[in-house]
A protein has these predicted regions:
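Extracytoplasmic gate region of multi-pass secondary transporters
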Residues: 26-31, 208-264
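Conserved MFS/SLC helix-loop-helix module at the cytosolic interface between two early adjacent transmembrane helices
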Residues: 57-95, 266
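Hydrophobic core of transmembrane alpha-helices in multi-pass small-molecule transporters
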Residues: 97-112, 297-310
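Helix-loop-helix hairpin linking two adjacent transmembrane segments in secondary transporters
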Residues: 137-183
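Flexible cytoplasmic inter-helical loops of multi-pass small-molecule transporters
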Residues: 183-199, 388-397
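C-terminal transmembrane helical hairpin of 12-TM major facilitator-type secondary transporters
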Residues: 249-255, 260-261, 266-319
Length: 400
């Protein structure tokens, strides 16, 4: 019975994430804002960058809130915020209006939803199945991008205002009933780590393994959101391909697939090794991308990048749970998610380099160097052993 309830929660979480995952198609919306309203590339990209910052910042608050109030209330609140943000953006179609409403308010709503459904689903499963369960839940966002890319392209064809309106109604109608199915298991949650962490938020920030995870999440998600933001333009510049939404959909499809694959692989070979493998795949794909000159070639490389990028959203929450326990998982994962907000700097730098150089090769080289650095860092990552020195303090050292 518990397994059935667990998968029901996981699938409901997948549905919520599917609806929340509209930002993965932002590059198409940005093109519409530029072509229809005359926004500059920086203006069109800025709401997404602000979304990343607000999303990651509010993940901390949402995670702590759901740890205490439960995931159902927080997810429902998130759905209402998402719908309101999209609907209101249709009536305030200025760079400042969309940035404030879609960037900040939508980011808060997304944090409430994503920060609640993943922890809730994970608590229903044993350690051996947490990677797979996490992969199933976060796959919703990847599938969303695959479906939303052509849908948003179609809606933007009728005007960005109409696109915001229709998407807003979708969110209001869709998230609320699914949120009613999101709940924690009764009684004690399944154990995750050998010695669960009870450190407070400022203590967790001093743990070496957490700092390493934050840096790795920063670089790798920053790499991914660079493609989410600029892929439509990259297709036109490097492959003379005007139907960039097809590459966006390809990236999204493999993004979704990567989440399931990463869950299965990490359950089998371990979290740290799976991370090293994922980062290495990203590095190799970026090296090949330097030579991209045709839609087919670029499509293959983008698919591999999407596969690796999707894996991040399975590997990192599963690793946080395995390393630090689930008692305060929402808070800990929220703190890690601030790295995604910092990763919003990467697409801004890529846009700046594109404006100076006329292509994205300089940005690709920057990402290659950064990914090589986190591969080395991942080789040093080991599961911590945690011992309580007192009620207030925890001492962490690496397993010998």
């Amino acid at each position: 019975m518990k397994v059935y309830e667990g998968w029901k929660v996981a699938l409901a979480g997948t549905g919520v994430n599917f609806l929340v995952g509209i930002p993965y198609a932002w590059s198409i919306m940005a093109t519409g804002l530029s072509q229809q309203l005359g926004w500059s590339p920086v203006q069109a990209a800025f709401p997404y960058t602000v979304f990343l910052f607000s999303y990651s910042f509010f993940m901390v608050l949402a995670g702590k809130w759901q740890d205490h109030a439960g995931p159902r209330l927080v997810t429902t609140t998130g759905g209402l915020l998402l719908g309101a943000a999209s609907l209101l953006s249709a009536f305030f179609l200025s760079p400042a209006g969309v940035t404030l409403l879609w960037g900040v308010l939508y980011g808060f709503g997304a944090a409430c939803c994503f920060g609640s459904v993943t922890p809730a689903a994970m608590k229903w499963f044993s350690q051996e199945k947490k990677g797979l369960a996490t992969g199933v839940v976060v796959t919703g966002m990847g599938v969303s991008a695959f479906v939303m890319a052509p849908l948003v392209y179609y809606l933007v064809g009728y005007g960005v205002r109409n696109a915001f309106l229709i998407l807003g109604f979708m969110l209001l109608v869709g998230v609320t009933p699914l949120a009613s199915l999101i709940k924690n298991p009764p009684g004690q949650a399944t154990p995750l780590a050998d010695s669960p962490v009870t450190a407070r938020w400022y203590q967790i920030l001093r743990i070496p393994q957490f700092i390493m995870l934050w840096l790795m999440f920063w670089v790798t998600t920053g790499t991914g959101v660079t493609f989410v933001t600029h892929l439509d333009t990259m297709a036109r510049v490097h492959a003379a391909f005007e139907r960039g939404f097809i590459l966006v959909a390809l990236f999204a499809f493999f993004n979704a697939s990567g989440r399931i694959v990463a869950g299965l692989v990490s359950d089998r070979i371990g979290r740290s090794r799976a991370m090293t493998l994922d980062f290495s795949v990203t590095l190799v794909a970026l090296l090949f991308l330097l030579q991209a000159n045709s839609p087919l070639y670029m499509g293959v490389v983008v698919s591999v990048l999407g596969l690796a990028y999707g894996g991040l959203y399975t590997l990192f929450p599963a690793t946080i749970a395995t390393f630090f326990g689930e008692k305060n998982f929402g808070l800990y994962y929220g703190l890690l998610y601030t790295a995604l907000g910092a990763g919003g700097l990467f697409p801004l730098i890529a846009g700046y380099l594109y404006g100076r150089q006329g292509d994205f090769k300089g940005a690709f080289l920057l990402l290659i160097i950064a990914c090589a650095a986190v591969i080395l860092l991942s080789l040093l990552l080991k599961k911590p052993v945690i011992k309580e020195d007192s009620v207030e303090e925890a001492r962490i050292w690496e397993r010998s």
